[in-house]
């Protein structure tokens, strides 16, 4: 059941009374100033934060430690939505040690998002890339494909200049995907 108080929506269950003091907890999603977080998991990935209007709030290469990840994401936990790339079981051709490292790092990201109560959706690379109408050619190697993605990110965010790197381009495109689909 929704209740309307001047200019804000509140849920009846979010009203809390403590010794004559009433606090109202704002429902997520009712604020128009939503932040969209895009995460390209992995040690060589990145995190991008976009405002609702498409302007870039922040973009960084992947923080190194779990504490750094948590500290960075906690800056943007209010009224945010996150889309994280669902790579599945790792990257084909990697050693078992590299796959385990990737899985551990991915778990750290997911736990940080869970601890901060940030609504999160996993999306496959095929799904978010389809929004940009890009197709990988069979003769393209990984570096050539990453350069295509980097060029697309640079065309969407020309104001960033050198901040669009091979580490951050996927995160920027994923956060723009989240903004466009209004997750």
Placement of each model-derived feature along the sequence:
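Methionine residue identity
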Residues: 1-2
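Phosphate- and other anionic-substrate recognition elements at nucleic-acid/protein interfaces
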Residues: 5-183
């Amino acid at each position: 059941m929704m209740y309307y108080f001047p200019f804000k929506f509140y849920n009846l269950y979010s009203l809390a009374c403590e010794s004559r003091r009433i606090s109202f907890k704002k429902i997520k999603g009712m604020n128009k100033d939503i932040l969209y977080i895009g995460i390209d998991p992995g040690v060589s990935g990145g995190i991008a934060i976009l405002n609702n209007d498409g302007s870039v709030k922040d973009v960084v290469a992947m923080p190194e430690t779990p504490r750094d990840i948590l500290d960075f994401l906690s800056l943007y936990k209010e009224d945010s939505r996150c889309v994280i790339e669902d790579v599945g079981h790792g990257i084909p051709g990697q050693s078992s040690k590299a796959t385990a490292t990737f899985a551990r790092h991915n778990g750290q990201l997911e736990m940080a998002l869970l601890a901060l109560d940030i609504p999160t959706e996993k999306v496959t690379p095929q799904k978010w890339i389809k929004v940009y109408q890009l197709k990988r050619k069979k003769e393209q190697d990984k570096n050539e494909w990453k350069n295509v993605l980097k060029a697309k990110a640079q065309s969407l965010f020309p104001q960033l200049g050198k901040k669009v790197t091979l580490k951050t381009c996927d995160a920027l495109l994923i956060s723009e995907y989240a903004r466009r689909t209004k997750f």
